[in-house]
Amino acid sequence: MQVYLVGGAVRDYLLGHPYQEKDYVVVGATPEHMLAQGFQPVGKDFPVFLHPETKEEYALARTERKSGQGYHGFQFFTDTTVSLEDDLIRRDLTINAIAMDQDGKIYDPYGGQNDLENKILRHVSEAFAEDPLRVLRVARFAARYFPYGFQIAPETLQLMQTMADSGELDALTPERVWKETSRALMENHADIYFQTLRDCGALKHLFPEIDALFGVPQRPEYHPEVDCGIHTLMSLQQACKSNYSLDVRFAVLVHDLGKALTPAEELPRHIMHEERGIKPVTQLCERLRVPTQTKQLALSVCKEHLKCHQIMSLKPGTLWRLLQRLDVLRRPERVEAFVQACECDAKGRLGLEDRPYPQAQYMREAMQIVRSIKVQDLPENIKGAEIGEMLIQYRIEALAEFKNQHQSLSHS
């Protein structure tokens, strides 16, 4: 039997990029051969084995044939007669269809090295269209390799468009869409993922709430970029630039969904867009089965981001209630994530990417103030329900003093 390193590890090796995961293809072996050598079977749909020592994945060379809709609509065939070329042709992109043997020799039957050199993302064969998940994968690769100048081949983008128009994307399970999207959100240029999906017509099928933002105007004095969709992607790029968490990036992505629901006669103003956004954010999260923690932050940012922008003018009681809703006493990290998302919104505007956002520090200091006030700070004779009431009173008074000090400093 012959063993070949394949896929992303070979691609990144040839690009000179670091890689961690290694996947191998085994040609000329049977499941019995693998078991006899101590490999552990793990594949449900086709023979995949874990190496007895390294625990790296070894898959028997296979071919596949479309047998139904969606990601699981395939029949696989594996046999000792299946060649390396047979296995590689079923892969998505030419740059992922390169193999390397144990001596370091490269096998590239479909021109992947040439496409790497020319910075092109190109599908290997028309079988690409049989797996709708590949539309999302190519969009994710476009995001990952955007800084290096990679572009999608026109014929591949056209094929993605055809797939989007065919309705095949509807067969994707929510779990698969979220898994691919959450990975894409953690790329350094996650905005390119969504722009690519829009370019091929997939965004309106998978994320209609986000697609609806494009073409919706905003007031140019606040948003020089004008377009709501462009602002959303610029804000997301700010979150990527700061290397923020998945929760923050997703919250930034959906913070303005309510603007797509603004009545035409009110444009370019977006009065009450925070409240209008609650329903589409909730629908999107439920449809994709977004994790609860991610959904909670997204809803908080959607509902409250304008309050963060206006934080220095908030009354102490209003600020306390905002901090309470963010669970400041039990989850200070959630307040920090909220602030990060709001700052991305403020900076995701044409020409304003580097402007200061003093509201962030103000919010952080306010958080520390309310968290520093403990039961031990109250008079000893306070009992029962009065304890909670007085704690709130003390915290609001402390926020009032903080606001006065801040105003005095800013006017001095």
Swiss-Prot record:
Its cofactor is Mg(2+); Ni(2+). CDD domains: HDc, NT_ClassII-CCAase. Transmembrane segments: none annotated. Pfam families: HD (PF01966), PolyA_pol (PF01743), PolyA_pol_RNAbd (PF12627). Magnesium is required for nucleotidyltransferase activity. Nickel for phosphatase activity. Mg(2+) binds at E21, D23. SUPFAM superfamilies: Nucleotidyltransferase (SSF81301), Poly A polymerase C-terminal region-like (SSF81891). ATP binds at G8, R11, R91, R137, R140. The keyword Phosphoprotein does not apply. CTP binds at G8, R11, R91, R137, R140. It catalyses: a tRNA precursor + 2 CTP + ATP = a tRNA with a 3' CCA end + 3 diphosphate; a tRNA with a 3' CCA end + 2 CTP + ATP = a tRNA with a 3' CCACCA end + 3 diphosphate. InterPro entries: CCA_bact, HD/PDEase_dom, HD_domain, NT_sf, PolA_pol_head_dom, PolyA_RNA-bd, tRNA_CCA-adding_enzyme. Its EC number is 2.7.7.72, 3.1.3.-, 3.1.4.-. It comes from the Bacteria. Coiled coil: none annotated. Keywords: ATP-binding, Hydrolase, Magnesium, Metal-binding, Multifunctional enzyme, Nickel, Nucleotide-binding, Nucleotidyltransferase, RNA repair, RNA-binding, Transferase, tRNA processing. One of its GO terms (biological process) is RNA repair. Residues 228-329 form the HD domain. GO terms for molecular function: ATP binding; CCA tRNA nucleotidyltransferase activity; cyclic-nucleotide phosphodiesterase activity; magnesium ion binding; phosphatase activity; tRNA binding. A single active site specifically recognizes both ATP and CTP and is responsible for their addition. Belongs to the tRNA nucleotidyltransferase/poly(A) polymerase family. Bacterial CCA-adding enzyme type 1 subfamily. Comprises two domains: an N-terminal domain containing the nucleotidyltransferase activity and a C-terminal HD domain associated with both phosphodiesterase and phosphatase activities. Monomer. Can also form homodimers and oligomers. Catalyzes the addition and repair of the essential 3'-terminal CCA sequence in tRNAs without using a nucleic acid template. Adds these three nucleotides in the order of C, C, and A to the tRNA nucleotide-73, using CTP and ATP as substrates and producing inorganic pyrophosphate. tRNA 3'-terminal CCA addition is required both for tRNA processing and repair. Also involved in tRNA surveillance by mediating tandem CCA addition to generate a CCACCA at the 3' terminus of unstable tRNAs. While stable tRNAs receive only 3'-terminal CCA, unstable tRNAs are marked with CCACCA and rapidly degraded. This is Multifunctional CCA protein. The gene is cca.
